[in-house]
């Protein structure tokens, strides 16, 4: 009997306005930075008679475990989620500080 679980422990996403410190101008672009830490837990339960033995292992993977194309897709999804949260916050009267 074997069971695998994936738990995303932490997701961080930051969006910055593109700012040129030399000219002190905003260039109108958004720069994004994202990462997450996922934990995969694999449980192998072996039953010998009426005794169960649990062999489990934990593996942590990060953003760098994926290829470039997958990283870009993840960034797109996280940016879309961030945008929805930011819009909801504005509707509630909260302000985003840069």
Swiss-Prot record:
<protein>
    <recommendedName>
        <fullName>SPbeta prophage-derived uncharacterized protein YorB</fullName>
    </recommendedName>
</protein>
């Amino acid at each position: 009997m074997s069971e695998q679980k994936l738990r995303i422990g932490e997701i961080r996403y930051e969006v910055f306005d593109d700012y040129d410190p030399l000219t002190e101008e905003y260039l109108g672009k958004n720069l994004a930075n994202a990462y997450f830490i996922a934990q995969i837990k694999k449980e192998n339960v072996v039953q010998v008679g009426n005794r169960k033995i649990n062999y489990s292992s934990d593996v942590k993977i990060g953003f760098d475990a994926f290829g470039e194309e997958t990283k870009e897709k993840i960034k797109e999804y996280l940016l879309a989620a961030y945008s929805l949260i930011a819009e909801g916050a504005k509707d509630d009267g909260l302000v985003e500080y840069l």
